[in-house]
Regions:
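Conserved Class I S-adenosyl-L-methionine
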Residues: 213-281
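Class I SAM-dependent methyltransferase SAM/SAH-binding core
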Residues: 64-122
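N-terminal auxiliary segments of SAM/dcSAM-dependent transferases
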Residues: 1-21
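Short, glycine-/aromatic-enriched active-site segment of Class I SAM-dependent methyltransferases
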Residues: 168-192, 204
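A short acidic, Gly/Pro-enriched loop at the edge of an enzyme's catalytic core
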Residues: 121-132
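Short alpha-helix
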Residues: 192-208
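Conserved alpha-helix/loop element of class I SAM-dependent methyltransferases that forms part
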Residues: 23, 27-36, 40-61
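A short glycine-rich, Lys/Arg-flanked "PGG" loop and its adjoining helix->strand segment in the class I
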Residues: 146-161
Length: 281
């Protein structure tokens, strides 16, 4: 995992997320979002992810939550505001943490949340520190997902829960085109790999988690997948020109390419999205 490259990507792309993704919503979210029959717009979908995960993990005001890979604090703020949980958000991006602290003050929940620049693979927190470890689309950046799971298990209290929402591979790519799609997506999103649902479930169980449950949410992110695709198809020519003129980092072209191919990968049955839950007994 190239931590500096990942931090730079999120730092540089922050304005794009603000203008094209979470828009005027107060989700401050950098993830896909879950859609149901009542969902009207992307802001609702982004908040739905928090609701679904919090319900599955049964988060209450008695819980201390580690938001691993917190971005600019969207989920942390939501958990503090709506669940009154004590939340610690961590990210490897100093700019994200600075923004998260500002948003916490504006939302008047800074007494419940704290943010720090910390690598989720090496947190430095004492054993048995948290009731819940929460991660949305951050574990995907780890070279070995097992390394994240081991650290999460270590910092969880006995009886603690882990809840993860992320991208997965529903099946290994078979055709040359499918392999090209996956390679382009990995490159653009700075991903070393993605696990299948079965591989990740097995990794959780080997780490020691019990009551591991897999929720395939691929269908529920489809509107966001298509939205990401349309934005990137529209923006790609402009991004290429801007990169050539050194107006934006060249890495943006690969990011746009990733957005363009992920829709086809999902439609082909290769790309997927899911929520993983487990408990430390």
């Amino acid at each position: 995992m190239d931590k500096q490259a990942i931090a730079t990507w999120y730092d540089e792309s922050s304005p794009l997320y603000r203008y094209f993704w979470y828009l005027n919503s107060d989700s401050f979210a950098l993830h896909y979002g879950l859609w149901d029959i009542k969902t009207k717009h992307i802001g609702d979908a982004l908040q739905n992810t928090n609701k679904v995960m919090a319900e599955q993990a049964n988060i209450t005001s008695n819980d201390r939550v580690l938001d691993a890979g917190c971005g600019i604090g969207g989920s942390s703020l939501w958990l503090a505001k709506y669940k009154k949980a004590d939340v610690v958000g961590i990210s490897i991006s100093a700019k994200q943490i600075e923004k998260a602290k500002t948003l916490a003050k504006q939302a008047k929940v800074d007494h419940l949340v704290s943010f720090s620049v910390i690598d989720y693979l090496h947190t430095g927190f004492p054993n048995d520190s948290f009731d819940v470890v929460w991660a949305i689309e951050s574990v995907c950046h780890a070279d070995k997902k097992e390394d994240f799971l081991k650290e999460a298990y270590r910092v969880l209290k006995k009886g603690g829960r882990i809840i993860i929402a992320d991208g997965f591979i529903r099946r290994e790519p078979e055709t040359e085109r499918e392999k090209q799609l996956v390679t382009a997506f990995y490159k653009g999103m700075l991903l070393p790999n993605l696990y299948t649902f079965d591989q990740f479930e097995d990794a959780m169980k080997k780490t020691g988690f019990k009551h591991v449950t897999v929720f395939d949410k691929t269908h529920e992110v489809l509107p966001s997948v298509k939205r990401f695709y349309l934005i990137c198809r529209f923006m790609y020519p402009l991004i290429v020109i801007a990169a050539v003129l050194h107006i934006v980092p060249y890495i943006f072209t690969a990011g746009c390419k990733a957005g363009s191919v992920q829709y086809e990968a999902v439609q082909a049955g290769v790309g997927g999205y899911g929520i993983m839950y487990g408990e430390k007994e």
